[in-house]
UniProtKB/Swiss-Prot annotation:
Protein name: Putative 12-oxophytodienoate reductase 12
UniProt-annotated binding residues for substrate: H188, A189, A190, N191
Organism from which the protein derives: Oryza sativa subsp. japonica (Rice)
Gene assigned in the entry: OPR12
Alphabetized UniProt keyword annotations: Fatty acid biosynthesis, Fatty acid metabolism, Flavoprotein, FMN, Lipid biosynthesis, Lipid metabolism, NADP, Oxidoreductase, Oxylipin biosynthesis
Lineage, uppermost ranks: Eukaryota, Viridiplantae, Streptophyta, Embryophyta, Tracheophyta
Cofactor(s) of this protein: FMN
């Protein structure tokens, strides 16, 4: 667990303004964070031909602050690691050209004093390519909670002999991320993608050492984490988990046990942080809903908090008020914001001032336009914006249903 510190006075903030937990400083290993508002890894589909583009320099630097943590969008570890035509143009980091393309983007974040981690992923069976994608299983995705796409290819089950090659791809991606200048690497083991497909028993029915009980199902993900940590250092390695998610037809029958196992294993390895997606459930009328809508299970991650000694990040629908609660109560060290940060490049400043938030434009989440819905969200007007201070309610009212990344 990192060190909680009393927040320093923020620029332009009145000395007698009530302290804001989200804006207190925090030591995450060797990294000194000036606040606890983290940019989620958000797929934006603007890396044409899997190559990061110059417009990403502006996008990320807009959201960078001195001592603020940004996590880059999911970045492929190999040519077959990404394959969703419905979400095209995702970046990679397996070639020299891609590494060179990332360098000026990373430099732009560092020029603002930001801390930048690269999220590395493999989509597994979440692919619609002609060549059969790899997974823990040969069963295709049959339904998605999102209902945005159902044309996934039928996967083939990865053989035990092939697993070391996939691990090598993650290792190379970690090496390349550091060469590009990133401060660290986040292993994407969440949201129904390859590593999650191994971890959850709703998908993984293998009878070998990579299946069966929770320890076997988590073996592959932990071998990837071990390899990445050996390359980058445990103090520069984070992991993203979503044990409670049903995303992409990938669910587990005992998510509490899965969450606790991964928290213990990652803690024993000394990885820098866990970035965990908040649990959700489908409400029934007896639970107070009209039936069928998704509702967050409040604060179910306490078991992860207790089992993992490193930095715990949480995300999935948090607003300003809830984020402050999570930090002040020790429920989490950092709070990850996706759609709120997407639409408000100056989100930490707006939180400080209690300022109104921009709404997001869902239609532009995954379009290829280098400006619209990407770098054109407005900042607060510098003329007189301090007059907006202390209206926390205005910020809290901008509930977004934020799911903090893909």
């Amino acid at each position: 667990m990192g060190v909680f510190q009393k927040g320093e006075d923020q620029k332009g903030e009145s000395a007698n303004m009530k302290p804001i937990p989200l804006l207190s400083s925090y030591d995450m290993g060797k990294f000194n964070l000036s606040h606890r508002v983290v940019l989620a890894p958000l797929t934006r589909s603007r890396s044409y031909d899997n190559l990061p583009q110059s417009h990403a320099m502006e996008y990320y630097s807009q959201r960078a602050t001195k001592g603020g943590l940004l996590i880059a969008e999911a970045t492929g570890v190999s040519s077959d690691a990404q394959g969703m035509s419905v979400i095209p143009h995702t970046p990679g980091i397996w070639t020299k050209e891609q590494v060179e393309a990332w360098k000026p983007i990373v430099d732009a974040v560092h020029a603002k004093g930001g801390i930048f981690f690269c999220q590395i992923w493999h989509v597994g069976r979440a692919s619609d390519m002609e060549e059969r994608p790899i997974s823990s299983t040969d069963k295709p995705i049959e339904k998605t909670e999102e209902n945005y796409f159902l044309g996934f290819s039928t996967p083939r089950s990865l053989t035990v002999e092939e697993i070391p090659d996939v691990i090598k791809h993650f290792t190379l991606a970690a090496k390349n991320a550091l060469e590009a200048g990133f401060d660290g690497v986040e292993v994407h083991a969440a949201n129904g993608f390859l590593l999650d497909q191994f971890m959850k028993d709703g998908v993984n029915a293998r009878a070998d050492e990579y299946g069966g009980g929770v320890a076997g199902r988590c073996r592959f993900a932990l071998e990837v984490v071990d390899a990445v940590a050996a390359e980058a250092g445990a103090g520069r390695t984070g992991v993203r988990l979503s044990p409670y998610s049903r995303c992409l037809d990938c669910a587990d029958s005992d998510p509490d046990a899965l969450a606790a196992h991964m928290a213990r294993e990652l803690g024993s390895r000394g990885v820098l942080y866990c970035n965990v997606v908040e649990p959700e459930m489908v409400a029934t009328p007896a639970e107070g809903g009209s039936g069928g809508e998704t509702m967050r299970i409040p604060h179910r991650l306490r078991a992860v908090r207790e089992a993992f000694a490193g930095t715990l990040m949480v995300g999935g629908g948090y607003d300003r008020e809830e984020g402050n609660w999570a930090v002040a109560g020790g429920y989490a060290d950092l709070v990850v914001y996706g759609r709120l940060f997407l639409a408000n490049p100056d989100l930490p400043r707006r939180f400080r001032l209690g300022a109104p938030l921009n709404g997001y434009d869902r239609a532009t989440f995954y379009t290829a336009d280098p400006v619209a819905g990407y770098t054109d969200y407005p900042f607060l007007d510098d003329d007189g914006d301090d007059g907006l201070a202390a209206s926390a309610a205005s910020a809290s009212s901008n509930k977004s249903g934020d799911q903090d990344g893909v």
